[in-house]
Curated annotation (Swiss-Prot):
It comes from Neoponera goeldii. Belongs to the ponericin-L family. The lineage of its organism: Eukaryota, Metazoa, Ecdysozoa, Arthropoda, Hexapoda. This is U1-poneritoxin-Ng2a. It comes from the Eukaryota. Keywords: Amidation, Antibiotic, Antimicrobial, Secreted. Expressed by the venom gland. Has a broad spectrum of activity against both Gram-positive and Gram-negative bacteria. Is inactive against yeast, erythrocytes, and insects.
Length: 24
């Protein structure tokens, strides 16, 4: 369960970073 949550968090983090880079 913890591993699954960590993977989801990492995926969300990458998506957020991609959006921020797109705005910049």
């Amino acid at each position: 369960l913890l591993k699954e949550l960590w993977t989801k968090m990492k995926g969300a983090g990458k998506a957020v970073l991609g959006k921020i880079k797109g705005l910049l």
